[in-house]
């Protein structure tokens, strides 16, 4: 059965398209795309060229002067200045003034030069010139003070005296060495062999300004106990037996009390500590030896300080010893009720020019007192300090030779009581 459609109306079948082949773009849209790309590239190129020209132009100018510049460092280039011509004012009227004359010369006085009149412009009429005042007298030049002028003038004789004093001190220090407690005790032992009434009291530990009164009272109390046949209450010496010490107390009539003094410590314990520190260092420092002689037979307290007032003034020391003498009158009264008197031996500084001969001077004074207690040997001292210490050096050499064979810190044997 035939189809109702006509055969002539049938179309030819379309062949299937191959999907693998690319679809071609028409030429008109492709040209438009190329034009856009070209315009964009040209615009970018123009912008780059413009910026390059701007940077090239401003490389020769100061970019930092613009407010939008990020740098804060000031510009070091000079700014162009615009000079505006200003009309010059008319010159002022010239008034002649006297010129200052040069400084005077010592050889001949100089005449001040005549004043030079100023030339005024011809176009400006000159005013009448006033009368020229007389020149002022030249001022005297101020003296220039040098460093030598600022220093005080010291005569040559002063330097000579200073040198002589230094040489004198060196000689004195070489003549008399410093004596320690061991040599002083040996010297006392040697004096005991010459004068049996002297008791060689130990100098270590030495008495001080804080305990010398208690030490003297303790010795006198022990002497009274020995005379009564009673046991002594005080401490025994380190290097002396009790029997030997009792014999010394029984026959003694003179107590030589050496005091060690230092101005710094204010108590007994501090004084002992200072003495130990100086002994460790091997230095005498500011220490000083003093001597108090208790003459039991003559009932006298004799105080000797070779520096005269190193501890205190002689007046104050005399008052203090007067009070102590009254105390001794009660501790050790005399049979005839005689009171203890006080004597300050030194009337001036004895050891002039020497700082370490105090121990030797104390022993020298004790030796003079033992020979003649009623003659003041200090009045016969030489005035010259070198000659004075030369005499002391002779005494020191004699004592050192005499005590050379004595044992260390050993008391000599006292005579028997009966």
From Swiss-Prot:
Keywords, in A-Z order: Hydrolase, Membrane, Protease, Secreted, Thiol protease, Transmembrane, Transmembrane helix, Ubl conjugation pathway, Virulence
MF (Gene Ontology): cysteine-type deubiquitinase activity; deNEDDylase activity
Pfam families attached to this UniProt entry: Peptidase_C48
Active site positions: 288, 305, 358
Primary subcellular site in the record, as a coarse category: secreted
Biased composition (Polar residues): 1-10
EC number: 3.4.22.-
A GO CC term attached to the entry: membrane
Topological type in the membrane: Single-pass membrane protein
InterPro entries the UniProt entry points to: Papain-like_cys_pep_sf, Peptidase_C48_C
Skewed-composition ranges (Pro residues): 86-141
Compartments, record wording: Secreted; Host cell; Membrane
GO process terms (BP): protein deneddylation; protein deubiquitination; proteolysis
Keyword Secreted set for record: yes
Region Disordered: start-end pairs: 1-23, 72-143
TM helices/strands, residue ranges: 40-60
Functional description taken from the UniProt entry: Effector proteins function to alter host cell physiology and promote bacterial survival in host tissues. This protease possesses deubiquitinating and deneddylating activities.
Family label: Belongs to the peptidase C48 family.
This protein's name: Deubiquitinase and deneddylase Dub1
């Amino acid at each position: 059965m035939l189809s109702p459609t006509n055969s002539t109306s049938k179309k030819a079948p379309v062949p299937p398209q191959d999907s693998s082949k690319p679809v071609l773009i028409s030429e008109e849209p492709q040209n438009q795309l190329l034009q856009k790309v070209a315009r964009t590239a040209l615009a970018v190129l123009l912008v780059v060229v413009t910026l390059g020209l701007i940077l090239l132009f401003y490389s020769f100018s100061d970019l930092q002067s613009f407010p939008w510049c990020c740098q804060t460092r000031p510009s070091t280039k000079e700014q162009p200045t615009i000079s505006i011509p200003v009309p010059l004012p008319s010159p002022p009227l010239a008034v002649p003034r006297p010129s200052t004359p040069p400084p005077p010369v010592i050889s001949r006085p100089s005449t001040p030069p005549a004043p030079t009149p100023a030339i005024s412009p011809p176009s400006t009429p000159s005013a009448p010139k006033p009368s020229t005042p007389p020149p002022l007298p030249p001022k005297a030049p101020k003296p220039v003070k040098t460093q030598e002028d600022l220093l005080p003038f010291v005569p040559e004789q002063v330097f000579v005296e200073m040198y002589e004093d230094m040489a004198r001190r060196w000689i004195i220090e070489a003549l008399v060495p410093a004596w320690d407690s061991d040599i002083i005790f040996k010297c006392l032992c040697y004096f005991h062999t010459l004068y049996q009434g002297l008791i060689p009291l130990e100098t270590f530990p030495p008495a001080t300004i804080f305990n010398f009164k208690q030490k003297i009272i303790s010795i006198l109390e022990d002497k009274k106990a020995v005379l009564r046949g009673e046991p002594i209450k005080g401490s025994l010496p380190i290097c002396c037996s009790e029997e030997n010490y009792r014999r010394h107390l029984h026959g003694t009539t003179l107590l030589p009390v050496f005091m060690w003094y230092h101005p710094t410590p204010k108590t007994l314990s501090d004084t002992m500590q200072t003495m130990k520190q100086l002994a460790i260092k091997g230095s005498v420092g500011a220490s000083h030896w003093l001597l108090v002689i208790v003459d039991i037979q003559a009932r006298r307290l004799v105080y000797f300080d070779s520096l005269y007032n190193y501890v205190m003034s002689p007046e104050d020391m005399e008052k203090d010893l007067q009070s102590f003498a009254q105390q001794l009158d009660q501790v050790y009264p005399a049979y005839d009720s005689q009171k203890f008197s006080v004597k300050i031996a030194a009337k001036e500084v004895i050891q002039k020019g020497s700082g370490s001969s105090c121990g030797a001077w104390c022993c020298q004074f004790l030796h003079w007192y033992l020979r003649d207690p009623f003659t003041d040997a200090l009045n016969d001292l030489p005035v010259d300090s070198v000659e004075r210490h030369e005499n002391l050096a002779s005494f020191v050499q004699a004592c050192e030779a005499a005590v050379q064979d004595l044992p260390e810190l050993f008391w000599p044997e006292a005579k028997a009581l009966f």
